[in-house]
C-alpha cells in the first residue's frame, strides 16, 4: 500500500477527483524510467481526465550519480511553477544530467537560473526529495519505476499496454 496516501504536497497532474490515481516513484537518471516515460505519457493522454498522475522522487543515488541533483532541480523548478516542464525535460534529455546541463534546462524553461543555482548548491530542496524517498521505502519501493494504482502496488511489467489495461480495470 502507498504510504502516505496522495496529499496536497504531491506533484499531481490531472483532476483531483479522477476515478484513478496513478503514482510513480521515479529516478530521472534511471534508464527503465526513461523507457517508461514516453509510454506513460501515451497512456495518460489516452485516458485523459479519468486519471490523475502523481510523481514522487526516488533517486537511486548508489547507481545514478546525477539523480539526486536532477530531483532537486525539479523541485527548484516547482518552486517557480514549472515542475512538470522540468520533469519532462529531464526525461527527454536523460543522458545529460550534469549540473551545467540542469542549469541550462532551467534557462530554457525561463526560470531564474541564479536562484536555481543557489538552491542546488545549498540543497534547499533535498528534504523534499528525501520525504518522497522515505515514503517510497515505507511503501516497499526498492527500484524504479514503481507504480501504484489507487494506493495499491502495480507489480506487472511497466509497458504501456499492461499499465493501460490495469488502469482501465480500475476505472
PLM features per residue range, with description:
Residues 23-24, 28-108, 112, 168-171:
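Structural alpha/beta surface segment adjacent to cysteine/selenocysteine redox centers
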Amino acid at each position: 500500500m502507498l504510504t502516505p496516501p496522495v496529499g496536497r504536497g504531491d506533484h499531481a497532474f490531472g483532476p483531483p477527483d479522477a476515478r484513478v490515481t496513478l503514482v510513480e516513484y521515479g529516478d530521472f537518471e534511471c534508464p527503465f524510467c526513461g523507457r517508461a516515460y514516453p509510454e506513460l505519457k501515451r497512456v495518460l493522454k489516452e485516458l485523459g481526465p479519468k486519471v490523475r498522475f502523481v510523481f514522487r522522487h526516488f533517486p537511486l543515488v548508489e547507481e545514478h550519480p546525477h539523480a539526486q541533483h536532477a530531483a532537486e532541480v525539479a523541485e527548484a523548478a516547482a518552486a517557480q511553477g514549472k515542475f512538470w516542464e522540468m520533469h519532462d525535460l529531464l526525461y527527454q534529455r536523460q543522458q545529460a544530467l550534469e549540473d551545467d546541463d540542469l542549469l541550462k534546462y532551467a534557462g530554457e524553461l525561463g526560470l531564474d537560473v541564479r536562484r536555481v543555482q543557489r538552491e542546488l548548491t545549498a540543497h534547499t530542496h533535498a528534504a523534499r526529495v528525501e520525504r518522497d524517498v522515505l515514503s517510497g521505502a515505507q511503501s516497499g519501493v526498492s527500484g524504479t519505476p514503481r507504480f501504484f494504482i489507487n494506493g495499491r502496488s502495480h507489480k506487472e511489467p511497466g509497458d504501456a499496454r499492461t499499465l493501460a489495461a490495469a488502469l482501465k480495470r480500475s476505472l
